[in-house]
Amino acid sequence: MVKKYKMHLLHKLEKEMTFNNLCLHPKILKAIQLAGYPKPTEIQQKAIPKIVQGFDIRASAQTGTGKTAAFLLPALHRLISPATKSGIGPRVLILAPTRELAQQIESQANKYSKSLQRIKTVCVVGGMPY
């Protein structure tokens, strides 16, 4: 009986989840709206809150389920949020196994950070002349 109730509750929570519930910076929420995302995917619902809270996570999901946004949105959130400690602040380095994936990640990062000040993305790949 408890398991059935828990599954029902989880299903209900997933149906009602919005990006506003994920504690992201208002500018990030605006970028999500401009990107046309209606609601977070399952991987985003599970990963974003944990990453925003400062946890390290390891997650996997099928292609096309929103994994890139699941790690990029909290990274951008952290970059534009006021620092809690003194210092130069956070920086982000994303490593990708293929050139195509690196370019896709940069494209998504540019889309989400379009209206954010002082955010610069650079894609560096090997094996090609510059």
Show where each model-derived region lies.
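Conserved pre-motif I regulatory segment
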Residues: 13-60
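Charged, alpha-helix-enriched surfaces in structured cytosolic catalytic cores
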Residues: 23, 27, 42, 46, ...
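Conserved nucleic-acid-binding Ia/Ib motif block in the N-terminal RecA-like helicase ATPase lobe
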Residues: 30, 34, 85-130
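Nucleotide phosphate-binding site architecture
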Residues: 38, 58, 76, 80, ...
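Walker A/P-loop NTP-binding motif
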Residues: 48-57, 69-86, 110-113
